């Protein structure tokens, strides 16, 4: 029912004559600005900023309380704005039914990021279910994208900002914002909604496969058109940049801004300290993170090396009941693989505890295929762990690469390759281990929080100048 209504609404909007549509959108946009003007004036007065210079930036991040790498990007971006642009108030659009105090407390506990709460406004969205995959059982990509357009309109209806930045990958919101407000639009893209890899992966043998390929190509064109509405686009890796450039066009203002990694504290860990023969997998408990194959590869490693003292530690956050069910599924799988005495699961560990794990484990594992970046991998390397990562995406092309001609870790693709890499990493001589740990840590200088804040701030300054030039 929801799918039918959303598609019908989309067709209705497209069917309206473009001139009439623009006129209607412009009129609605003017009303939205007038409606929010008194609220903005009150905010500026409360925080003591000059109204003529004051601006609001809307961060579109419906799952802002998830506690993962994407949320670290969001909150460090907010910190960058608060640090470098004192006249700007950050507006965070969220669908999380959690108080401002609770959200900021989790930000502090999870990421060690302190924010000025007086310069943050949370706008609570009621229609977040429209971007949930569970809402769209068929045509999921299209459904979520149409849903994001409706959710994007709800966002600017509740609070019309001066600048709009999407930090979760909802490119179709750009069309809505430009249609109703025509304000500067920025984006931080973690990964493309559809990629050229996806298009290449589908073999056109059956009729169904051909239909699916036609659907994907049509959607890729829609995605490309939506992305072209952004004024400035940041990507988290060269892999993501290349895909976005091929989809959205090379003429867009596109730059790589590596995500913030809290390396300063981790680099204080004594790299010479004795470590336990433990493999650490630091990742949100979600199916795409491939925890199942981490368990299977570890089980294979033990089949091949039954006397090994190695252990596996899985540490990650959960977003709700669905993720907790996934954790329970993983525990069941670990038991089936006879790993129950060798595997430990940790859920929603506070940052100090994560640092403790990073300081005692030997190997850091990454198993997600084509991961857009891999903040956890950088944290491994900064803390002195030897990374064993997937031979794809950001970990392959940007992170675990030779440093001054010397290796910084291992790459693997299959379960057997991972098992072999675990063995190689665990059986390096003490001198070889130390050299690789030092190389890995040295390579992390490119990914510090201060580097992200500087690079994000440079792009935000362009968006701000564009807004000032329009007034």
Swiss-Prot record:
InterPro entries: ALG11, ALG11_N, Glyco_trans_1. It holds the Pfam family ALG11_N. This is GDP-Man:Man(3)GlcNAc(2)-PP-Dol alpha-1,2-mannosyltransferase. It comes from Schizosaccharomyces pombe (strain 972 / ATCC 24843) (Fission yeast). Keywords: Endoplasmic reticulum, Glycosyltransferase, Membrane, Transferase, Transmembrane, Transmembrane helix. Pathway: Protein modification; protein glycosylation. Its EC number is 2.4.1.131. Belongs to the glycosyltransferase group 1 family. Glycosyltransferase 4 subfamily. The keyword Membrane applies. Residues 26-138, 160-372, 394-471 are cytoplasmic.
């Amino acid at each position: 029912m929801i799918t039918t209504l959303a598609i019908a609404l989309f067709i209705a909007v497209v069917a309206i004559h473009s001139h009439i549509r623009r006129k209607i959108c412009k009129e609605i946009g003017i009303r939205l600005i007038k409606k929010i003007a008194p609220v903005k004036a009150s905010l500026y007065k409360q925080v003591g900023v000059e109204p003529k210079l004051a601006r609001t930036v809307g961060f579109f991040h419906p799952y802002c309380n998830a506690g993962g790498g994407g949320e670290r990007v969001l909150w460090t971006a907010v910190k960058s704005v608060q640090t470098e642009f004192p006249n700007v108030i950050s507006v965070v659009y969220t669908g999380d039914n959690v108080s401002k105090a609770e959200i900021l407390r989790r930000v502090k506990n999870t990421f060690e990021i302190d924010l000025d709460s007086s310069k943050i406004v949370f706008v609570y969205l009621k229609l977040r279910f429209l971007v949930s995959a569970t809402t769209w059982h068929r045509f999921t990509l299209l459904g979520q994208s149409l849903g994001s357009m409706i959710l994007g309109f709800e966002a600017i209806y509740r609070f019309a900002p001066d600048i709009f930045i999407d930090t979760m990958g909802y490119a179709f919101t750009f069309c809505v914002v430009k249609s109703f407000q025509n304000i500067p639009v920025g984006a931080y893209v973690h990964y493309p909604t559809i990629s050229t890899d996806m298009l290449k992966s589908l073999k056109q043998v059956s009729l169904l496969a051909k239909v699916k390929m036609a659907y994907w190509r049509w959607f890729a064109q829609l995605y490309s058109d939506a992305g072209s509405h952004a004024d400035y686009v940041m990507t988290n890796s060269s892999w993501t940049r290349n895909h976005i450039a091929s989809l959205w066009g090379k003429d867009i203002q596109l730059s790589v801004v590596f995500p913030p990694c809290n390396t300063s504290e981790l680099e204080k860990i004594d790299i010479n300290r004795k470590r336990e023969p433990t493999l650490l997998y630091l990742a949100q408990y979600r199916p795409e993170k491939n925890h199942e194959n981490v368990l299977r590869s570890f089980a294979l490693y033990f089949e091949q090396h039954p006397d090994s003292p190695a252990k596996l530690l899985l540490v990650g956050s959960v977003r709700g009941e669905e993720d907790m069910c996934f954790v329970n599924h993983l525990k069941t799988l670990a038991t089936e693989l006879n790993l129950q005495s060798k595997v430990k699961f940790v859920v929603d560990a506070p940052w100090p505890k994560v640092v403790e794990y990073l300081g005692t484990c030997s190997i850091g594992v990454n198993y997600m295929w084509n991961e857009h970046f891999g903040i956890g991998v950088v944290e491994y390397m900064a803390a002195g762990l030897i990374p064993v990562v997937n031979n794809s995406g950001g970990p392959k092309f940007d992170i675990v690469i030779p440093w001054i001609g010397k290796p910084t870790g291992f790459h693997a693709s299959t379960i057997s390759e991972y098992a072999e890499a675990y063995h190689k990493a665990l059986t390096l001589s003490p001198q070889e281990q130390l050299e690789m740990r030092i190389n890995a840590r040295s390579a992390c200088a490119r990914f510090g929080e201060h580097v992200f804040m500087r690079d994000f701030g440079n792009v935000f300054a362009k968006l701000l100048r564009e807004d000032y030039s329009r007034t």
